[in-house]
Structures are given as structure tokens and as C-alpha cells.
Design a protein with these regions (language model features):
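Noncatalytic scaffold domains of N-terminal-nucleophile
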Residues: 51-52, 63-283, 288-340, 413-419
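A short, polar/charged loop-to-alpha-helix boundary motif
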Residues: 170, 461-476
Length: 480
């Protein structure tokens, strides 16, 4: 069997007018031969378009399906040439075992290795997501949470909400006199859900032992990984005038082991985090929510004025949400519902569907891009009203109304091909939509048809700036 090829979406970008779409994700594909040229399927192209639309939207999760006999290209008659004979471009056959896509090639490879060991997409996703928390700790990790969309081999769907929840002591006006407390320190952290979310996924869908799928991340944290450009950039962004990476001993152990911050290409190890993951691998997910790991987490948060308790950790449970679904140019697209923004992504696609000539020719690329931009602006306006269905009245009604044809047609009528509009046109309520700092997205599929799309985050870069000294866990600031 040939070794899996690592394919970056950048290998595809420069071959077509879709080169406006940028992605750093790395895709590992497990296959048996490489005789065919790489032909991206529509299921790869649509998430790429959505990534352009919603790079800043948290929890964008889409799974696309289409009729078996459908040869329809979803962007009409203009088909980009992905078959350039340039020898420098990657080529690969469709995977025989499946495929895993994450932001880091090491983590994608961990997922494929799990597939090769007899695991399925659920096992692979757990391995890759935990790895991302090791390497891309600036925006993801077990101190945070996320949302998953699962498509089973029999084409049923499930949304797993493992977002952080507010501690029991939280109250409505707790940040009224200190808004920074929602961003930095112990009060900024919600109860982490990532481990419970991965536990739910693995126990319901996985086939390999839990310890087996956790071990790759343990080894990556212990043996080390190269410092990349993203980590350098985010350290520079977060350090500020007082460089806590070097001056705070808790952080310096990992980020400045020699007294100065790590540089590009250096090998970074996270031994405390490796020990933490190893304990979770050996004793199970509950080791995160009780015992030493939980106790040290609560101590660290309370030392930074937090109110989270062991009871908050022990009482955490995942939530199962409804799916959102549309038909788009003959394809069925499934996404998540509130509190994530899946319905907004679908709304944008429905607006774009009204343009029959979207990307029809190379000459229409600029106009089509403008239309996408305008649809996104209106989408962001509607996004400001989304909230947690448990605490926001009539959220299901709002989501369903967002996708009715009359709403789509009304939005289309407001879009001009010749200009943009005043901000009030997109968001009449005048609510400010701040830039969202970043999340990590992973997709895993296997040869049974099981497909899982997951978005995880600790919210802002380096979360609440609270690291648990004993475990190396970086806590989220999701209360913001």
C-alpha cells in the first residue's frame, strides 16, 4: 500500500479562478494507488467556498450530499481546470480507507494512522482534534469546547454541542463594572466541554480503545513539534508590553524554556500537557472532570478570581441539537443550528442560489465574488440575533424564518451589482459584530460513509491567559 499523500488546498487554488479562496488546512488521504490526477469532489469545493464566507464565524459545520447520478457542478457551467499537467502540483487517488483534514499535517497524519489501524472516522477525529490542541494551543485545546456534526453511514445526522457552559455562580450583570474580567482571568472561563464531546463521539461511534486514539497527541506533546509561523504570529500578538510567555514561569516552561521565546523552526515540547493527556488516556475522560486534573484547574481559576467549582465540572454534559438543512442547486447541505451559526451559512448559500450565473465564466469571477461578499454582509446582520435556544425565546422560529424563500428573495432584492451599501442596510439594529479571533476545523470521513465535521476553540487567542501550572491546560475565555 502506498503511503498517504498530504494535499494542501493551496495546490488547487492557483489552477482556477477560485484562487481567491485561501486555506491552510492539510488533508491526509489513505489510499492504495496514485494513478489518477487529483480531482476535488464537490464535497470538498463547497466547504472551501463556505470557508471564504465564514472564516470568522464560529462553528461553521457543513456536510454536503448529492444524488448518486448527479454530475451537476454546483457553480453552474464554469468548471475550473483542476487537471493542469504541472508536475509541481499534488495528485492523489480517492482514499480507500478515508481522509482527514485539519489545519496541521501532523494532526491530519495522526488521523490517517488511526484509520490504518482499523479505526473509523470517529476514532480519527478524536486523535486529530487532541493533536490540534497540542500544536495549535493558541486557539484550541481541552480547556475549551466546540460543536460537531455527524453523518452516519445510513445518512442520519446528529449535532453534538460540547460548547463551554457558564459556572453555576455566574449572573447576568457580573461584568458590568469590570468588562475586562470577561476576557482575562478566572471569571472569563466557561466550563470546558471538549473532552466530554470527544467522549460522546467515541463511545457512540468509535471502534478502537479510547487510550489508542489519545496516544498520538500524547506522543506529539512529549516528543515535540516544530514551531510554525502561526504560533510565532500569535505569540507576538498576545505578548504585549509584558511578555507573559517569558516572565510568567507557568508559561515559560513551554514557550521560553531557555529564557527567550521559541523561534520559528525550534522544537516545542509540552510535557505537562502530555502527562495530562496520558492520564485521560489511561483513566478515561472522567479524569478531566474530577480528581487531580479538575482540582488543579479549579485552583488556578479561583486564584485568578474565578468562581468555577468542582461541581461545575462534574455536572457538565453535552447537548444534542437539531440540524439545519437546505437544498442547494440539487445538493442537500446539512449544518448545525443555534447556538452555532450554521443556519447563517445556509442562508448565504440560498441567497447565492438565486444567481443562476454565479461563477459561470472566468469573466464573472469579480462580480460573483462581490455577490458573495454582499450575501455575507446580510448574513452577519442576521447572525447578531442568534443565541442559545435554552435562554433565547423563539430561536427555532427565527432560524426557520431565516431560510424561508420570502426572506431569501427580500435579501436578494437589496443586493446591487454595482455598489456596497451603508452598514445600516445590512444590520438595521446597529449591533457591532466584532472580529472573532479564531477556531480550528477538522473533518474526518471513512469508507463506511461515516463523516464528522468538528469546530473547536478556546475563543480568543490563548483564551483567558490562564494556564493551569500543574497540567499545562490553557483555559478558554468563552464567557466573553
Amino acid at each position: 500500500m502506498s503511503q498517504p499523500r498530504l494535499i494542501s488546498n493551496r495546490d488547487v487554488e492557483n489552477q482556477s479562478s477560485l484562487n481567491l479562496i485561501s486555506s491552510n488546512s492539510k488533508t491526509s488521504i489513505a489510499h492504495q494507488h496514485t494513478s489518477q490526477k487529483y480531482r476535488p469532489r464537490v464535497t470538498a469545493i463547497i466547504p472551501t467556498l463556505i470557508k471564504l464566507c465564514f472564516l470568522a464565524i464560529l462553528s461553521l459545520l457543513l456536510i454536503v450530499s448529492h444524488p448518486p447520478n448527479s454530475n451537476t457542478w454546483p457553480f453552474n457551467s464554469f468548471k475550473p481546470n483542476f487537471d493542469s499537467d504541472s508536475a509541481s502540483r499534488s495528485k492523489s487517488a480517492p482514499g480507500k480507507l478515508g481522509a482527514v483534514a485539519s489545519e496541521n499535517s501532523i494532526c491530519s497524519q495522526h488521523g490517517v494512522d488511526i484509520l490504518r489501524k482499523g479505526g473509523n472516522a470517529a476514532d480519527a477525529l478524536v486523535a486529530s482534534e487532541l493533536c490540534v490542541g497540542v500544536i495549535a494551543m493558541y486557539h484550541s485545546g481541552i480547556g475549551g469546547g466546540g460543536i460537531m456534526l455527524v453523518r452516519t453511514p445510513n445518512s442520519s445526522y446528529e449535532v453534538i454541542d460540547f460548547r463551554e457552559t457558564a459556572p453555576a455562580a455566574a449572573f447576568k450583570d457580573m461584568y458590568e463594572h469590570n468588562k475586562n474580567a470577561s476576557v482575562y482571568g478566572g471569571l472569563a472561563s466557561g466550563v470546558p466541554g471538549e473532552i466530554r464531546g470527544l467522549e460522546y463521539l467515541h463511545s457512540k461511534y468509535g471502534v478502537l480503545p479510547w487510550s489508542t486514539v489519545v496516544q498520538p497527541a500524547v506522543q506529539t506533546a512529549r516528543r515535540g513539534f516544530p514551531v510554525g509561523e502561526d504560533l510565532i504570529r500569535y505569540m507576538n500578538h498576545a505578548a504585549g508590553y509584558e511578555d507573559f510567555f517569558t516572565k510568567n514561569p507557568t508559561w515559560a516552561i513551554d514557550f521560553a524554556p531557555g529564557g527567550a521565546r521559541l523561534n520559528l523552526g525550534d522544537t516545542m515540547t509540552r510535557h505537562r500537557y502530555a502527562d495530562t493527556l496520558e492520564a485521560i488516556a489511561k483513566y478515561g475522560p472522567s479524569a478531566f472532570y474530577s480528581g487531580r486534573i479538575a482540582e488543579t484547574m479549579i485552583n488556578a481559576l479561583q486564584n485568578e478570581n474565578g468562581t468555577m467549582t468542582l461541581g461545575d465540572l462534574q455536572n457538565y454534559t453535552v447537548a444534542i441539537r437539531n440540524i439545519s438543512q437546505i437544498d442547494y442547486r440539487g445538493y442537500k447541505i446539512t449544518s448545525t443550528s443555534a447556538p452555532s451559526s450554521g443556519v447563517i451559512a445556509l442562508y448565504i448559500l440560498k441567497v447565492l442560489e438565486t444567481y443562476k450565473d454565479l461563477f459561470r465564466t472566468e469573466q464573472s469571477v469579480n462580480l460573483s465574488t462581490h455577490r458573495i461578499n454582499e450575501a455575507i454582509r446580510f448574513g452577519y446582520g442576521r447572525r447578531t440575533y442568534l443565541g442559545d435556544p435554552l435562554f433565547t425565546d423563539d430561536m427555532a422560529t427565527y432560524e426557520s424564518q431565516t431560510l424561508v424563500q420570502s426572506m431569501i428573495d427580500a435579501t436578494r432584492s437589496k443586493i446591487s451589482d454595482h455598489r456596497t451599501q451603508n452598514i445600516s442596510a445590512y444590520d438595521p439594529a446597529g449591533l457591532e459584530c466584532l472580529e472573532t479571533p479564531g477556531t480550528s476545523h477538522i473533518v474526518a470521513v471513512d469508507n463506511t460513509g461515516l463523516a464528522i465535521s468538528s469546530t473547536s476553540t478556546i475563543n480568543h487567542v490563548f483564551g483567558s491567559y490562564v494556564m493551569v501550572p500543574e497540567t499545562g491546560i490553557i483555559m478558554n475565555n468563552e464567557m466573553n
